[in-house]
């Protein structure tokens, strides 16, 4: 599965449009180039939809969100939906502010997402949004210690991810010490990460960009593509 999905990516060299944060934009661009994809970053509302129309995947990341980015994300997402282009959302720190919560709620309402890549605290925050519950505690953009996906908590996190995937009709990629990838029916658990990955900024953002590329290159096997991206990243 991994070798096939990666071979498809390198053969097709998909163009990935990322509306992403300025902390990790260069890292994401270089990672896409390294894996065989082609990056383009365009966040101005006047061109975002046009760029998406020429791309093979759309990666939306709210890490450095501002009010100008929201219409760009919505316009690009609508264009992607109209053209059948996969859309991945990385809801960075969604529980940290009302702007982030409101933006993610609007994106979930107005766009058809292919996948959401998030840590456990972000997934829980989205689940609360979908249930119209008050926002819970936040650790900024990091997962709270009690939310980390460990072997001991694996079952409850698989259940959470599967329920959200089924409700939203998209793939949920819940990342942490153990990574969970699910479409609501089947769940894949991946154990090849390393504790040092939590000591740098941008690993999640890079994985989101990489996953968008894998989804673009493997349109008929999205779950396998998402799992392959996580395996590749570690």
Model-derived regions, located:
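Small-residue (G/A/S/T)-rich helix-start motifs and N-terminal tracts that mark the onset
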Residues: 1-82, 86, 158-234
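Glycine/small-residue-rich loop that forms an oxyanion/phosphate-binding "nest" at active or ligand-binding sites
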Residues: 69-118
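Conserved phosphate/ATP/ADP-binding segment of small-molecule kinases
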Residues: 99-187
């Amino acid at each position: 599965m991994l070798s096939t999905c990666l071979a498809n990516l390198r053969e097709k060299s998909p163009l990935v449009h990322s509306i992403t944060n300025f902390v990790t934009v260069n890292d994401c661009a270089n990672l896409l180039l390294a894996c065989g994809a082609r990056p383009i970053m365009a966040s101005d509302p006047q061109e975002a939809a046009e760029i998406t129309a020429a791309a093979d995947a759309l990666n939306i990341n709210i890490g450095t969100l501002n009010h100008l980015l929201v219409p760009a994300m919505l316009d690009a997402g609508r264009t992607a939906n109209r053209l059948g282009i996969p859309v991945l959302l990385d809801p960075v720190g969604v529980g940290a502010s009302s702007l982030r919560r409101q933006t993610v709620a609007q994106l979930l309402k107005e766009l058809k997402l292919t996948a959401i890549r998030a840590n456990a605290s972000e997934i829980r925050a989205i689940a609360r949004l979908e249930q119209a519950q008050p926002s819970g505690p936040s650790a900024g953009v990091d997962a709270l210690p009690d939310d980390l996906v460990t072997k001991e908590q694996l079952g409850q996190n698989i259940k959470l991810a599967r329920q959200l995937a089924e409700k939203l009709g998209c793939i949920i990629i819940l990342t942490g010490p153990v990574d969970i990838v699910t479409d609501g029916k089947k769940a894949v658990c991946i154990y090849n990460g390393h504790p040092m990955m939590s000591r740098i900024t941008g690993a999640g953002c890079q994985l989101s960009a990489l996953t968008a590329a894998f989804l673009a290159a493997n349109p008929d096997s999205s779950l396998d593509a998402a799992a392959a991206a996580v395996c590749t990243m570690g």
